[in-house]
Amino acid sequence: MPLEQRSQHCKPEEGLEARGEALGLVGAQAPATEEQEAASSSSTLVEVTLGEVPAAESPDPPQSPQGASSLPTTMNYPLWSQSYEDSSNQEEEGPSTFPDLESEFQAALSRKVAKLVHFLLLKYRAREPVTKAEMLGSVVGNWQYFFPVIFSKASDSLQLVFGIELMEVDPIGHVYIFATCLGLSYDGLLGDNQIMPKTGFLIIILAIIAKEGDCAPEEKIWEELSVLEVFEGREDSIFGDPKKLLTQYFVQENYLEYRQVPGSDPACYEFLWGPRALIETSYVKVLHHMVKISGGPRISYPLLHEWALREGEE
């Protein structure tokens, strides 16, 4: 059976938005007004939902403004900005349709990002490299002008949620291979029919423990995960059974240790880094990684400097 057919039921339905916001991916921006938030909400990476891959091809994207020499670096494209200016001068004539046009455009763009993420996850599961030509032909299609934005957001999604990085190994042929973040040897796949790597979830847990010190109480882990809308006893659309991941899979892979707090009555439990995590990465690398993907110092790690000094002495 083709890989794409085997993996159809593995697509998550929702959850990326909350995870991206909680990790600070869009938190580095200045506060926006309600109108600005409404206009730009669908442009953020974390609104991409893999379960919303369209069955039919998205409509053609708008053509670039005449004379434009480079792709805009934000989602507030000059084409739409000019449309807003024009519409603001016509308020007395009736409501403008340009905001609706932008909303539709941003939604279509987000679907393209979601479709590319799903395509890349299939490639990762098959352990195959991917080329720019494949991405353009299989996913992007006539949205080639916006490929840099689509590719950037899809790459950020892979790194933030799934713990996967894309590395260009052939700049001429634009060939990319997949690598797990922080050089971890764990691919995050739990079975033959899984395309949703759990490496990103593991990195989040390692970061929570590092933030706490040498160990983290189990209740603290769940408190932090609740911000990502991941809860004990509730199946997650991306990560599956989080309790089983934490106390069984990651422990069996030697990335975590799960033990009873000595002398606790009633019994309390805590998590520590396992021997495999200690060999493959370090506290400071994990914390630096989380700060990087958060887009800035929104997540506070007071022990970051302490651990950096400690590792420098070793």
Curated annotation (Swiss-Prot):
It holds the Pfam family MAGE_N. Residues 21-44 have a biased composition (Low complexity). Disulfide bonds: none annotated. One of its GO terms (biological process) is negative regulation of autophagy. Residues 1-99 are annotated as: Disordered. GO terms for molecular function: histone deacetylase binding. PROSITE patterns: MAGE (PS50838). Keywords: Tumor antigen, Ubl conjugation, Ubl conjugation pathway. Residues 1-20 have a biased composition (Basic and acidic residues). GO terms for cellular component: nucleus. Residues 109-308 form the MAGE domain. Expressed in many tumors of several types, such as melanoma, head and neck squamous cell carcinoma, lung carcinoma and breast carcinoma, but not in normal tissues except for testes. Ubiquitinated by the DCX(DCAF12) complex specifically recognizes the diglutamate (Glu-Glu) at the C-terminus, leading to its degradation. InterPro entries: MAGE (IPR037445), MAGE_N (IPR021072), MAGE_WH1 (IPR041898), MAGE_WH2 (IPR041899), MHD_dom (IPR002190). It comes from the Eukaryota. Residues 65-87 have a biased composition (Polar residues). Activator of ubiquitin ligase activity of RING-type zinc finger-containing E3 ubiquitin-protein ligases that acts as a repressor of autophagy. May enhance ubiquitin ligase activity of TRIM28 and stimulate p53/TP53 ubiquitination by TRIM28. Proposed to act through recruitment and/or stabilization of the Ubl-conjugating enzyme (E2) at the E3:substrate complex. May play a role in tumor transformation or aspects of tumor progression. In vitro promotes cell viability in melanoma cell lines. Interacts with TRIM28. This is Melanoma-associated antigen 6.
